[in-house]
Structure formats: C-alpha cells, structure tokens
Amino acid sequence: MSTYIDYSSKIYSIYLKYFDPKDIHIYSIDEVFIDLTPYIKHYKLSADKLIENILFEILKTTQITATAGIGTNLYLAKIAMDILAKKQNINKDGLCIGYLDEMLYRRKLWQHTPINDFWRIGKGYATKLKSIGINNMGDLARYSLNNEDKLYQIFGVNAELLIDHAWGFESCTMQAIKEYKSKHISKVMAKVLPKPYSFKKARDMLKEIVDHMVLELIEQNLTCNQIVLDVQYDKESLEKVQSYNGPMSKDSYGRSIPKNAHSTINLDYHISSLETICNKGLELFDLIVNADFLIRKISLTLNNVVKNDTIKKIKEPSLFADIEQKENKNFIKEEKLQKARLAIVHKYGKKSIFKASSLENGLKINSQIGGHNA
C-alpha cells in the first residue's frame, strides 16, 4: 500500500505542474477530477491534446499507463473514463482517452449494459430498475418523461440524480465541490477480518479499533459524542447455527449471510476518553451481536466530531458535582497517558508500542495504511 501511495503522489505532482490545486478534486487514491476550462486557452491546446501530454508524462515518469475521460460535466467525464477509456478506447499511441458530451452520451451509451457499469448505480439500484422494465440509461431517460413520480416513490430524493444522469446532465460543479463543507464530521474505521472470528476474538479486535481511533482523536485534539457499530457476519455462521431463520442479507460476493448487527449509542457529552468510548463500544457490541455467529467485518464510526477547544467548558451547577469533578480528573490523567503514547509513537514509529492482545488478533492495525497492509 505504501508503494501505491508513493506512485499516487508522483502522479499528483505531475498534475501540479499543469494545474492549480483549486482546479483538482481528489476523488480517490487513483482518480482525480480536473477542471480544464481555464487551461485550454492558457496552453493553446485542445482538451484531448493537453490530456495526451499529461498521460505521456505519467507513462514516462512512472511506467504506468493512465486512463482519462473528458466530458462537458463531471458525470460525463467520469463515464467517459469508466466505460469508454477503460473498456473501449485505446488510440494509436496506446493511450486510453474517452470523450463525451450530452448528445454523444445518448448515442453511444443509452443502450449500454449492464446498467450498473454507470457511476452511482449499484446492484441494488439495478435490480429495482429492472423490476420496472429499465435495463439501460435510454430506458431510464424515456421512463422519466411520463413516470417521474414513480421513480421518486422508489428512489426518494436520489431519483433526481438518476434522472439527470440518464440524460447526461450533472448539476454539481468543481466550484461546488470545493466550497462544500460538511455540517457533521465523522471518523470511520472498517476492518475486514482475515478469517471468521468468534464473538470473543471479534470483541478483542473492537478494542484494538477503538484504541487506534481514540489515539487519533487525541492527536488531532478532537472529541465525539456518538458511536455507531456495524458488524457483518461470515457465511459459515449459517452452517454453525443451522436453526437460524432470522433476517438475511448478502455479502459482497452475493452469498447469503445473517443480517448485519447495526446500532448507535449516544454519549453524555463530547469526549475523547479511551475508557469511556471503549466501554460504550463494547456495551453496544454485547447488546447487538449474536454470540453464536462468526464475524467477518467490523465497522466503527465516531460521530459529531469537533475540536476539543470548541466545546462549552462551563456547566450548570449539578448535584453530582463531586462525581463529575472526579471523572474530569480521570479524563485528564488518561489524556496525559495517551499523549505520552503519541510522543513515543512520533519518535520511534507506529510499531514502537502495542498491547499484548494485539499479537493474538492477526490484524496488525499499526502496520496498515488506510486499512491495507503497508
């Protein structure tokens, strides 16, 4: 994973030679959106020629063949890359570049299948669309002319985006992306376990995840006041508990598994206390997880994350003032301990401190980057 990040950084540095960062939106570790509009005149090149030059430089610098999509809006650029460049277009120089405007999109891709090749249409949406006779984007566009209300009944507010995309429209601009600021910030860690874990072993892994996330909160001077836990069971659970006849779902391979255990617990106030967050997380785990099942994935979300110094410090007088004062002293003591851990980690590296239980869990969180082995 660290090699992947190194190459991603090298490629991004090439973009910066041509474009201002304000005109680049990093979509993922290996995809970006770039607003070419001001640069076509600046470089006196067509959009496709400018992109060719950049792809050649990427190839020369990294020996990686990159793909690109050019479109009259963000959606069409994405589709031009995902469907045309990656699956159809390789030019005489060996470069993969796709181009779409609204009319080309309708001529070339309205009949394209499967429909879940299109951005933001997953298997679930594809199944719902098929149930009303829609198999491609052309079907969806024509259906929307007389049955818009039906689409809103099925997909809610997301119907607007589906209809726009069926016609090749996209209202979101690069400027809107750059100006967007989320009202609520969350921190999420999801771990796919290397093999099916027992209840106890998965519970121990949750402790490791909480420890890692709380340390991150303290490092960034952040607090949270809500915990969301999602636990996905393994398919072998059905073999282990053959009498189970409760709710079912599918894993990423389409195999039947017991429905995920999912719930939320609110904290009394914003904190970054390892003890409190861990205890509440385990309380939630014990409450919602079936102890007889095997577990394959754990996702933990810390919600309503804010800076520690933005929290109102002065509280109303309380009958439990002595208890609260004692709790506050414990928090301060614990925070000092976690900051001492951070100081050691910063000086000697992530692997310099670990708990003995970490050796048993088979998932080395400190050796990973973004959930992948470094």
Question: Which residues fall in each region the model found?
Answer:
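Acidic, metal-coordinating catalytic segment for phosphate/diphosphate chemistry
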Residues: 254-374
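Gly/Gly-Pro- and Ser/Thr-rich, intrinsically disordered tail segments characteristic of DNA damage-repair
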Residues: 1-174, 319-374
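Short, acidic Gly/Pro/Ser/Thr-rich loop/turn segments
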Residues: 41, 75, 236-238, 307-309
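Glycine-rich beta-alpha junction loops
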Residues: 72, 233-235, 304
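Residues at or immediately flanking beta-strands
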Residues: 65-67, 228, 297-299
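Short Gly/Ser/Thr- and Asp/Glu-enriched loop/turn motifs at secondary-structure junctions
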Residues: 27-31, 71-74, 222-226, 293-297
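DNA-contacting surface of Y-family translesion DNA polymerases
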Residues: 127-294, 310
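Solvent-exposed residues in well-ordered beta-strands and their adjoining turns
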Residues: 37-39, 232, 268, 303
